[in-house]
From Swiss-Prot:
InterPro entries: DapD_Trfase_Hexpep_rpt_fam, Hexapep, THP_succinylTrfase_dom1, THP_succinylTrfase_N_sf, Trans_hexapeptide_repeat, Trimer_LpxA-like_sf. Homotrimer. Keywords: Acyltransferase, Amino-acid biosynthesis, Cytoplasm, Diaminopimelate biosynthesis, Lysine biosynthesis, Repeat, Transferase. Transmembrane segments: none annotated. The gene is dapD. Belongs to the transferase hexapeptide repeat family. This is 2,3,4,5-tetrahydropyridine-2,6-dicarboxylate N-succinyltransferase. The keyword Protease does not apply. It is found in: Cytoplasm. It catalyses: (S)-2,3,4,5-tetrahydrodipicolinate + succinyl-CoA + H2O = (S)-2-succinylamino-6-oxoheptanedioate + CoA. Substrate binds at R106, D143.
Length: 274
C-alpha cells in the first residue's frame, strides 16, 4: 500500500500535466483503478476512526480526484435510463444476482450507487443517490430520495430517512466529510453538512438542518457547541431568541435530552422524540 500512496502523491504534484505524459498516465490509471476497487471493497476508506478521533486519509481523496482528471466520460445504460459520466455505476444493469446475494444487500429500482463506494452486508438501498468515496456500514438503510455525498461515512445499523441529505466533501483535502456513527437515526428531510459528526446512538428529528456554523444548544443548560452532535443525543429544530426585543430569533438545533446506551436500545425513536 505504501508504494501506491507514494505513486498517488507524486502524481498529485504534477496533476496539471499528467495527461501529457502517456507512459505515466497508463501506469497511474492502473493504480487509480486498483484504488477504486479497494474503495469498493472497503479495504481503504477516505476517513477512519483511530481511537476517539476521525482521521482523513488525504491520499484517498487525491486518488478519487485524479480518477476524475484521468477518466473520460462515457455513455452508460440500464434498462430504463442512460447517462454520460466519468464514474461507472457500482452495480451495472448486467450485475449477476449472486453478487447481491453474496453481498447480502438489497437495492431497489431507482437506487443510484457510483463505483468507489463501499456497501456492507445487510444494507438496504431504496431509491436514493450514493456518491463515490462513501462508506455505508452493516445493517444500515438508505431510505427513499436520501442523498449520501462523496466520501460521507455512515456507521452500522443507521437509518437515513426519506429525503434527507448527508453532505460529502472532496476538497479541501484535509476537510472531514459528514460522519454518522453507529446506531444513529436521521429524520426525514433533514440535512447534515459541512463536516458535522453525529456521534453514536444519536437521534436527529425530522427537518433538522446542521452545518458547521449551526448553533447546537443544550436545552437544560443553554450551552452552545458547534460541529458535532454528542453521543446518544436527541436533537430537534429550534430557535434562539434575539437578545434585543423586536428582533428576529435565529435558527438553531436543540439537544432536548441525552440517553444512555441501554435506554437508546430499549426505547423507540418516537418515544425518544416525545
Amino acid at each position: 500500500m505504501s508504494d501506491i500512496i507514494k505513486e498517488i502523491e507524486e502524481a498529485w504534484q504534477i496533476k496539471e500535466n499528467i495527461l501529457n505524459d502517456s507512459l505515466k498516465l497508463i501506469k497511474l490509471k492502473s493504480i487509480l483503478n486498483e484504488s477504486i476497487k479497494s474503495l469498493n471493497q472497503g479495504i481503504i476508506r477516505v476517513c477512519e476512526k483511530q481511537g476517539n478521533q476521525w482521521k482523513v486519509n488525504e491520499w484517498v481523496k487525491k486518488a478519487i480526484l485524479l480518477y476524475f482528471i484521468t477518466t473520460e466520460s462515457q455513455l452508460y445504460n440500464n434498462n430504463y435510463n442512460s447517462w454520460y459520466d466519468k464514474v461507472a455505476p457500482k452495480f451495472p444493469a448486467d450485475t449477476d444476482k449472486n453478487i447481491f446475494k453474496e453481498a447480502a444487500i438489497r437495492k431497489v429500482p431507482g437506487a443510484i450507487v457510483r463505483t468507489g463506494t463501499y456497501i456492507a452486508k445487510n444494507v438496504v438501498i431504496m431509491p436514493s443517490f450514493i456518491n463515490i468515496g462513501a462508506y455505508i456500514d452493516e445493517g444500515t438503510m438508505i431510505d427513499t430520495w436520501a442523498t449520501i455525498g462523496s466520501c460521507a461515512q455512515i456507521g452500522k445499523n443507521c437509518h437515513i430517512s426519506g429525503g434527507s441529505g448527508i453532505g460529502g466533501v472532496l476538497e479541501p483535502l484535509q476537510a472531514k466529510p459528514v460522519i454518522i456513527e453507529d446506531n444513529c437515526f436521521v429524520g426525514a428531510r433533514s440535512e447534515i453538512a459541512e463536516g458535522i459528526i453525529v456521534e453514536e446512538g444519536s437521534v436527529i428529528s425530522m427537518g433538522v438542518f446542521i452545518g458547521s456554523s449551526t448553533k447546537i444548544v443544550y436545552r437544560d443548560t443553554g450551552k452552545i457547541i458547534y460541529g458535532r452532535i454528542p453521543a446518544y443525543s436527541v436533537v430537534v429544530p429550534g430557535v434562539l431568541p434575539s437578545p434585543e426585543a423586536g428582533k428576529p430569533g435565529l435558527y438553531c438545533v436543540v439537544i432536548v435530552k441525552q440517553v444512555d446506551k441501554t435506554t437508546r436500545a430499549k426505547v423507540s425513536i418516537n418515544d425518544l422524540l416525545r
